[in-house]
Amino acid sequence: MHNTTKRVTVPALEEILYEPIKVLDYGFIRVIDYMGDDSAIVQAARVSYGKGTKQLNQDKGLINYLLRHYHTTPFEMCDIKFHIKLPIFIARQWIRHRTASVNEYSARYSILGNEFYLPEPANIASQSAVNKQCREGDSLPKEVAEKVLAILEEDARQCYGHYKELMNADEEGNIIDENATGIARELARMNLTLNYYTEWYWKINLHNLLHFLRLRADPHAQYEIRVYAEKMLEIVKAWVPFVYEAFEEYRLQGANISRKGLDVIKRMINGEKVTHETSDMTKREWEELMKIFG
């Protein structure tokens, strides 16, 4: 039977629908469903106009205008649903974005698989001395990184062994020892390390997805969540290319400047030599402003 649809479809997204996109060692992202495209945003903004009533360059210009001026509602007309497999410690950071609908694999009802994340040696670094929430840019020496990986792997395997022992069940749920009594899955799971993988379905509208990507695809974001965001950016580019171009122009590669920062720029344009001491800005504000201008 030939399936037809009257809904808008995006060929580039249809090609990757349901296909797992590998992330990290055992993780993936799959696009499960979506609604809308660039034209849906334009149509919502114009309300009374249907698809195709304006030239493409006018549609693109309108999307640029909407994003540039923070008119968010039209972007909420597009939705996308993902199936994502990710380490638990990243899931806990990810779930802080509360504007999505989420349904996670339940370790109360099912037994988690024996898959855990181990970082590449190049991504193992010490704590940053200036940023309390991230690692330094330089990797640790090879022998130190290897020791770290050995500890992480040993702990994960030992905890999973205890997990099965506590439940008295293997990965498939088969009883290990007929003469022993296991505890409930909802209790046994507490002993697993946070680098074990979980899965969830994550549905979100385009506006909130762009907000998520602006934060999580940023160079300051943790590497392990940033790589997921970078894959999602590629998906957004395939799904809504006009929106992606505007997002890249005004959010990813653009910059917000404070009133004081704008005043500094005006003074510099007028030929004044402005320093941190004469800028009325904090040291951090000044450094961030100077970074914008290279």
From Swiss-Prot:
Organismal lineage: Bacteria, Pseudomonadati, Pseudomonadota, Alphaproteobacteria, Rickettsiales
Protein name (record): Flavin-dependent thymidylate synthase
Organism of derivation: Rickettsia conorii (strain ATCC VR-613 / Malish 7)
Cofactor: binding comment: Binds 4 FAD per tetramer. Each FAD binding site is formed by three monomers.
Gene field: thyX
Chain positions of motif ThyX motif: 96-106
Protein's job: Catalyzes the reductive methylation of 2'-deoxyuridine-5'-monophosphate (dUMP) to 2'-deoxythymidine-5'-monophosphate (dTMP) while utilizing 5,10-methylenetetrahydrofolate (mTHF) as the methyl donor, and NADPH and FADH(2) as the reductant.
Residues that, per the record, bind FAD: 73, 96-98, 104, 205-207, 211
Database matches in Gene3D superfamilies: 3.30.1360.170
Superkingdom per UniProt: Bacteria
